[in-house]
C-alpha cells in the first residue's frame, strides 16, 4: 500500500508495483478506465480508436495481475446514485439543489476549487467512477476473500495524470481506496520494459468477482457520455424506455432540453475551461438555467487525457471518441443502463443496500472536496 503518487517517477512506480505483485499475502486488483482501451494500441502500432479491451486485460495478466476490473462498473454506480439524487430533488421541488455539476473530472474540479469556490458547493458529492471502483474493489474483495482491506492492493490504469492526485481524496468513512495510479503511457512503458508486446499477448477477461459493466458506463470516457448515461438511467428508473443519444457529437458545448416522464430537464455537456467560463457566465447572469452540467477538462473528454499516448491531434481524438462510442455499444447485450447490469445488482444486494443508503454514502461519497 502506498501514499506516494509517483508523479514523473515511472521506474520507481514499476518497482513498487512489482514488489506488491510478488508479495504472496497481497491480492492485487487493477481497474481499466474506458478511454485507455481505445488509445493504448497507438503505442504498439494499432490505429487510433481500436477497442483493445481484452488485449489490455491480457497485457495486465502478463504483467502479473490476476484480477482486472472495468472502471465503467464504478461509472454505473456513480450514475445510478446521481440519477436517484436528482430525481429525489425534482420530486421535492428543491430548486436550490440545482444546477449540479459532475464530480468525474479531477482536472476541472482542481480548476474550480481555485477559480470558482461557490461553484464547488454544487459539485456532486458522489465520488468519481475511478474512486468508486477503488472503494468497491477494496470492500468487495476483502469480504469475498476474508482478507483485511490493507492486503487488497488497488491499482488503476488511467488516461489522466491528475488521477494520481485524486487517489489521495478521502471518502465519507475517512479512507482512501486507490493505492497506485498508472497512466496509459506508463503502462505501455512498463510493458515494453518487460519485453511485452500488446499484439502478441493473449486476450484476457475481467475478474469473475466483478465481471460486468454497462453500455452507459463505458461511454463516460468521451464528452457527452456522462449526460447520455444520466438521462437514460433516469428514464429507465421512471419506466420510460428512452436513450439520450443526441450527445454523441463532438461540439465543445452541447446544450439540450430533454423531457423524461413528467420532468423537463435542461442539461449541458462542456469540454475545456474556456467553454465552461462562457456557460458559467450565462448561469450566473440568469440567462441559462440547468439541472445538470457535465464538465470535462480535456478535448473530447478522457480520450484526450494528459496520460494518453503522444503525439495527438484532432483526427486522433475523433478516432478515439468514435471508437469508444462503438465499444460502449458492444455492451448492449449485457446492459444498457446500470440497473440492468448483473454486477451492479449484486453489489447493491450484497454490499451497498440501495441508492442513497447510509452504506452507499459511506462507501461511494466523498468526505470533503479539499483540492
Where are these regions (language model features)?
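Iron-sulfur-associated redox domains of electron-transfer enzymes in respiratory
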Residues: 5-371
Amino acid at each position: 500500500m502506498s501514499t506516494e503518487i509517483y508523479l514523473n517517477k515511472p521506474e520507481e512506480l514499476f518497482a513498487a508495483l512489482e514488489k506488491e505483485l510478488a508479495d504472496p499475502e497481497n491480492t492485487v486488483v487493477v481497474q481499466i478506465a474506458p478511454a485507455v482501451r481505445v488509445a493504448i494500441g497507438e503505442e504498439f502500432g494499432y490505429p487510433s480508436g481500436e477497442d483493445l479491451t481484452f488485449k489490455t486485460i491480457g497485457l495486465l495478466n502478463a504483467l502479473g495481475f490476476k484480477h482486472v476490473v472495468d472502471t465503467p462498473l464504478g461509472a454505473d454506480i456513480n450514475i445510478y446514485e446521481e440519477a436517484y439524487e436528482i430525481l429525489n430533488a425534482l420530486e421535492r421541488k428543491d430548486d436550490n439543489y440545482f444546477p449540479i455539476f459532475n464530480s468525474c473530472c479531477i482536472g476541472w474540479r482542481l480548476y474550480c476549487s481555485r477559480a470558482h469556490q461557490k461553484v464547488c458547493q454544487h459539485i456532486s458529492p458522489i465520488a468519481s467512477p475511478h474512486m468508486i471502483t477503488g472503494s468497491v474493489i477494496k470492500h468487495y474483495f476483502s469480504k469475498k476473500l476474508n482478507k483485511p482491506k490493507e492486503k487488497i492492493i488497488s491499482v488503476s490504469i488511467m488516461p489522466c495524470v491528475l488521477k494520481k492526485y485524486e487517489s489521495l481524496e478521502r471518502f465519507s468513512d475517512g479512507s482512501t481506496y486507490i493505492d497506485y495510479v498508472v497512466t496509459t503511457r506508463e503502462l505501455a512503458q512498463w510493458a515494453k520494459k518487460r519485453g511485452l508486446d500488446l499484439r502478441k499477448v493473449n486476450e484476457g477477461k475481467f475478474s469473475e468477482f466483478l465481471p460486468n459493466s454497462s453500455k452507459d458506463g463505458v461511454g463516460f470516457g468521451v464528452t457527452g457520455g456522462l449526460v447520455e448515461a444520466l438521462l437514460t438511467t433516469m428514464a429507465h428508473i421512471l419506466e420510460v424506455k428512452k436513450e439520450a443519444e443526441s450527445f454523441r457529437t463532438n461540439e465543445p458545448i452541447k446544450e439540450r432540453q430533454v423531457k423524461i416522464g413528467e420532468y423537463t430537464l435542461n442539461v449541458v455537456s462542456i469540454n475545456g475551461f474556456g467553454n465552461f467560463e462562457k456557460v458559467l457566465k450565462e448561469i450566473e447572469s440568469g440567462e441559462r438555467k440547468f439541472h445538470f452540467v457535465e464538465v470535462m477538462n480535456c478535448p473530447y473528454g478522457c480520450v484526450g487525457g494528459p496520460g494518453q499516448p503522444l503525439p495527438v491531434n484532432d483526427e486522433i481524438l475523433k478516432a478515439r471518441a468514435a471508437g469508444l462510442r462503438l465499444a460502449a455499444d458492444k455492451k448492449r447485450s449485457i446492459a444498457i443502463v446500470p440497473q440492468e447490469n448483473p454486477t451492479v445488482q449484486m453489489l447493491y444486494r450484497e454490499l451497498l443496500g440501495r441508492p442513497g443508503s447510509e452504506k452507499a454514502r459511506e462507501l461511494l461519497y466523498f468526505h470533503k472536496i479539499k483540492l
